[in-house]
């Protein structure tokens, strides 16, 4: 599985997930400088945090 790994709205960077990490993850939240985005491979989909504006977990290549 490959997942996007950049912190921007459009993403050209992806990585091959390590063994056991078969979920692509994207989390968004707001900071003083605007919206922040985190993307990576994970083993389990995390809970939506109190400051998160959205959370996406998926198993299709580069779906995050």
From Swiss-Prot:
Disulfide bonds: 3-24, 6-11, 17-41, 45-57, 58-63
Intracellular or extracellular location(s): Secreted
Major localization listed first in the record, in broad terms: secreted
Keywords: Acetylcholine receptor inhibiting toxin, Disulfide bond, Ion channel impairing toxin, Neurotoxin, Postsynaptic neurotoxin, Secreted, Toxin
UniProt keyword annotation of Nuclease present: no
UniProt-listed Gene3D superfamilies: CD59
One GO CC annotation: extracellular region
Expression across tissues: Expressed by the venom gland.
InterPro entries: Snake_3FTx, Snake_toxin-like_sf, Toxin_cobra-type
Superkingdom per UniProt: Eukaryota
Pfam families per UniProt: Toxin_cobra-type
Coiled coil spans: none
Residues of the signal peptide: none
Any one GO molecular function term: ion channel regulator activity
CDD domains the record matches: TFP_snake_toxin
UniProt function note: Produces peripheral paralysis by blocking neuromuscular transmission at the postsynaptic site. Binds to the muscular nicotinic acetylcholine receptor (nAChR).
Family: Belongs to the three-finger toxin family. Ancestral subfamily.
Name listed for the protein in its UniProt record: Frontoxin V
Species of the source: Micrurus frontalis
């Amino acid at each position: 599985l490959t997942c996007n790994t950049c912190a921007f709205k459009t993403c050209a960077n992806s990585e091959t997930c390590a063994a056991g990490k078969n979920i692509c993850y994207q989390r968004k939240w707001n900071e003083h400088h605007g919206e922040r985005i985190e993307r990576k491979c994970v083993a389990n989909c995390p809970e939506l945090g109190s400051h998160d504006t959205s959370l996406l977990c998926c198993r299709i290549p580069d779906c995050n």
